[in-house]
Amino acid sequence: TRIMKITSVAVLGAGAVGSYVIWGLANREDIKLGVIAEGERKERLSRQGCAINGKVYHPEVWTPEEAENVDFLIVSLKYGALPGALESIRKIVGKDTSVMSLMNGVDSEEIIAEQIGKSHILPAVIKVASHREADGYHFDPETTLGIIFGEYEAPYESERVKAVKELFAGTGIHYRSTEYAIEEVWCKFRLNVCNNLPQAILGAGVGCYRDSEHM
């Protein structure tokens, strides 16, 4: 197999999760980094950039057509936005594109796979407490657990997994590969349902599990 090296990365969804990826990869001068946007949003992102942790980053801004056959596509949309983005994903993904979905919910990988085929997808989950303030997105790089990813089946230490590790290495992004990527996705889903739902009902903040004797 040819040695894989990721030289171009597209981020679809430049919100809380996408910001973590942009923040990390913006420092890599050996890759092309772009955010996917069209029309008025493309103009705005090109003009204003992405404000993250008090600094403004200016990744390139690509239409789905301009991003066609990118090496690595990271989908970090809000769950409800996925159906409307499937056509964009189809346009972006070429025969050598790998796709990582960093979305909540357990079926985003399946929904994307229906469009482009499962072989393009590297299952993953992200754990980052990122929130929006007036001056953009904020998170603590030190305490962020980061991105957990791995192949659906052996060989787990695939060319693609090695290429993604190499991409993230030294960027500040926290990451690890695992043989249990699918279980990790379910585990996060369970956490969201079992922790965040009661929290939402009670109107309590994320820290309440550590602080309150009632939770």
Language model regions located:
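Internal alpha-helical scaffold of NAD(P)-dependent oxidoreductase catalytic cores
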Residues: 62, 91-92, 115-120, 135-215
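Flexible, glycine-rich phosphate/dinucleotide-binding loops
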Residues: 18, 42, 108, 130, ...
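Rossmann-like NAD(P)(H) cofactor-binding subdomain of soluble oxidoreductases
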Residues: 54-138
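Short, charged/polar "capping" segments at the starts of alpha-helices
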Residues: 41-46, 109-110, 157
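NAD(P)+-binding Rossmann beta1-loop-alpha1 motif at the extreme N-terminus of oxidoreductases
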Residues: 4-58
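A structural signal for isolated positions on well-ordered beta-strands in alpha/beta enzyme cores
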Residues: 10, 32-34, 100, 122, ...
